[in-house]
């Protein structure tokens, strides 16, 4: 049931984005040919890039991508339900340099490593934070 809801969600996202943007995706066939877990590390100069990339990659990658999302974005009230739907992981804010944030970051790294070893795929937008 969850997979059907996720497919519908990404379909609606693509439809909404199509109203404003023309997107051309090259190389999806190469992703479809991959077997096993995938770690995707795209760049995103605009805030619209993550939903655009995710909505198109969702169809291409055999295993659903689990995004890692910065905590400031993750907890935006209207985005939080979507974050839970797509099973995003929250990346803690390390700018405060707290021990709890560092521990959460280490736990997240361990979770991603275990996930990759277990066959899961992830998408991480490196931002230097």
Model-derived features: positions:
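Short hydrophobic helices that act as membrane-entry/anchoring signals
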Residues: 2-21, 80, 84
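Residue-level preference for long, well-ordered alpha-helices that form the structural scaffold
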Residues: 1, 5, 101-104
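Soluble catalytic domains of membrane acyltransferases
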Residues: 19-129
């Amino acid at each position: 049931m969850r997979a059907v809801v996720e497919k519908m969600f990404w379909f609606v996202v693509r439809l909404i984005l199509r109203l404003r943007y023309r997107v051309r995706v090259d190389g999806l066939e190469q992703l479809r040919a991959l077997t096993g877990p995938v770690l995707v590390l795209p760049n995103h100069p605009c805030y619209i890039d993550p939903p655009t990339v995710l909505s198109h990659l969702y169809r291409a990658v055999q295993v659903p991508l689990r995004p890692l999302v910065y905590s400031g974005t993750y907890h935006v009230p209207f985005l939080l339900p979507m974050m839970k739907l797509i099973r995003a992981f929250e990346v803690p804010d390390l700018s405060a340099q707290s021990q709890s944030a560092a521990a959460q970051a280490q736990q997240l790294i361990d979770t991603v490593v275990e996930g990759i070893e277990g066959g899961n795929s992830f998408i991480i937008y490196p931002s230097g934070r």
